[in-house]
């Protein structure tokens, strides 16, 4: 029996500066997967037929929505669900957030938000609520 799921750390970059986070050094300083690196990973996932769930994390993966959508829309040859771990900053622009969700809602299985007592100083709760309300 193979693995049922896997995670892709898309980027080390993040727009929040949460003090407790290992990625708190600032926005432009970390590695982001190139499209070539990402395709190599996705092709390997395609060769692993037991994987039916991919978690996309970072840093903040939604700094790179085109790469996130590349993961979502890759041809795995089977149904693969996607989860996204985000701070929700992209909910500030409700129209862009709505368009992203509408384009991808059939494949996104879960969006989890980084928000708690440690994050709230750096993350606007309203942005998260905007996404949840879509």
Question: Which stretches of residues belong to each language-model region?
Answer:
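Canonical Radical SAM [4Fe-4S] cluster-binding loop centered on the CxxxCxxC motif
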Residues: 1-36, 48
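Acidic (Asp/Glu)-rich catalytic clusters
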Residues: 44-48, 71-77, 99-108, 131-133
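Generic structural signal for well-ordered secondary structure
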Residues: 11, 61-64, 68
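Core AdoMet radical
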Residues: 25-33, 50-64, 79-93, 105-128
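Aromatic/hydrophobic pocket-lining residues that form the small-molecule binding cavity
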Residues: 38, 67-68, 97, 128
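Alpha-helical scaffolding within the catalytic cores
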Residues: 4, 93-102
């Amino acid at each position: 029996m193979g693995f049922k799921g896997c995670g892709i750390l898309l980027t080390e970059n993040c727009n929040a500066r949460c003090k407790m986070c290992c990625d708190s050094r600032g926005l432009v300083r970390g590695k982001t997967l190139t499209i070539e690196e990402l395709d190599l990973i996705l092709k390997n996932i395609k060769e692993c037929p037991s994987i039916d769930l991919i978690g996309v994390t970072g840093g903040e993966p939604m700094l790179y929505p085109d790469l996130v959508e590349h993961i979502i829309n890759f041809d795995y040859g089977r149904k693969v669900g996607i989860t996204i771990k985000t701070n929700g900053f992209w909910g500030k622009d409700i129209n862009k957030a709505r368009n992203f969700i509408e384009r991808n809602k059939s494949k996104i299985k879960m969006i989890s938000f980084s928000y708690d007592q440690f994050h709230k100083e750096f993350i606007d709760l309203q942005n998260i609520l905007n996404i949840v309300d879509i």
